[in-house]
């Protein structure tokens, strides 16, 4: 609806269901659905954390992203020159006890939602297993453009993320809902984080994860968007000493070169999603 209301301002990615995973016609129905979405203007496809963590087949097994049944789907997305976005796994904090988590927002969220706190669900896959399965998909599909949502669920260490970006040239990541982890690492080692953004300036997309879920008034939502944008803009373009409710420690802005900031905030989205500039 947003795309229809403002096509010049809003682009969309689509998704597909796995609720009918064991239907013999699942593949053909999914391919037809994706083509209809592409014809309607979708610039990519997003897969969600339900794959690997929630959705199960009729035998009760978790559906995993590296299942061969997905191969023709990912191949088709690549042939149509579209992007696959992946919110796969969760932040590594999800597998840690609350007192060991690195950001206050994760601590609050998993404290309120123990059902999603994997530390309390030892029978569920580990963070390492889910990331390994994602990596196998990228190994099998080297020409597929992939944007890892939420820093590719490697938000806890830019060195680990850099290893994946080196290994998979068609992989990029967005920063949505993971600025707390960026702030935390900046407080620990600003130079390392700053160098990461400069070295991988063509592979990082700004995002917020903010949405209108009906819980806030329009004024509250607008204020939240403005506050987040101003905070993050200050972090990227100045060397100010800053504080954030996301972490307990002060940190210093990265003061990135203008050309890097322009890519992170705008140009990379145009390039990776094939948007009209």
Question: Where on the chain are the PLM-derived regions?
Answer:
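H/E-rich (His + Asp/Glu) clusters that bind or coordinate divalent metals
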Residues: 118, 122, 127-136, 141-277
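Active-site gating/metal-coordination segments in enzymes
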Residues: 2-118, 179
């Amino acid at each position: 609806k947003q795309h229809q209301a403002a096509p010049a301002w809003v682009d969309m990615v689509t998704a597909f269901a796995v609720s009918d995973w064991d239907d013999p016609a699942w593949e053909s129905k999914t391919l037809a659905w994706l083509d209809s979405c592409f014809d309607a203007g979708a610039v990519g496809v997003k897969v969600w954390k339900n794959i690997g963590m929630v959705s199960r087949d009729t035998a009760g097994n978790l559906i995993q992203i590296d299942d061969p049944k997905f191969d023709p789907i990912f191949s088709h997305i690549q042939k149509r020159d579209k992007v696959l976005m992946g919110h796969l796994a969760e932040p590594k904090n999800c597998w840690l006890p609350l007192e060991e988590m690195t950001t206050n927002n994760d601590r609050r969220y998993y404290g309120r939602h123990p059902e999603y706190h994997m530390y309390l669900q030892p029978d569920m896959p580990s963070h390492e297993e889910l990331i390994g399965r994602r990596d196998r998909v990228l190994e099998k599909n080297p020409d597929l453009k992939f944007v890892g949502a939420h820093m590719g669920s490697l938000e806890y260490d830019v060195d680990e993320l850099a290893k994946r970006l080196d290994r998979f040239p068609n992989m990029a990541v967005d920063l949505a809902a993971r600025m707390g982890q960026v702030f935390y690492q900046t407080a620990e080692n600003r130079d390392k984080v700053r160098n990461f953004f400069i070295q991988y300036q063509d592979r990082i997309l700004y995002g917020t994860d903010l949405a209108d879920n009906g819980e806030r008034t329009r004024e509250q939502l607008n204020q939240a968007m403005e506050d987040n944008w101003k905070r993050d803009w200050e972090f990227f373009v100045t060397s100010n000493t800053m504080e954030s409710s996301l972490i307990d420690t002060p940190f210093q802005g990265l003061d990135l070169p203008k050309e890097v900031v322009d890519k992170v905030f705008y140009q990379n989205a145009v390039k990776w999603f094939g948007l009209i500039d």
